[in-house]
Amino acid sequence: MKYSLRIEVRLKPGHSDPEGETTARLLRELGYSVETANVSKAYSLILRAGSKKEAETKAEEMCNRLLANPTKDNYVIIVEEEK
């Protein structure tokens, strides 16, 4: 079966986000009332797996092996069956 994966990787609280800070500052300079901005990466993948649980497990492995740095990143995984 095919599964659609959406993985969002973002910095853990307490880690500096220079790109987010710059974005917030520039938006304020443009007149927007932005207090904070956080930059994250989003991955959209199509994966073949035997079950939704297997797809979730493989997505976790991908995050731990490549997509996220466990020292500084948190991630959210959404798995849906492709129709």
Where are these regions (language model features)?
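Long, contiguous binding/interaction regions
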Residues: 1-44, 50-83
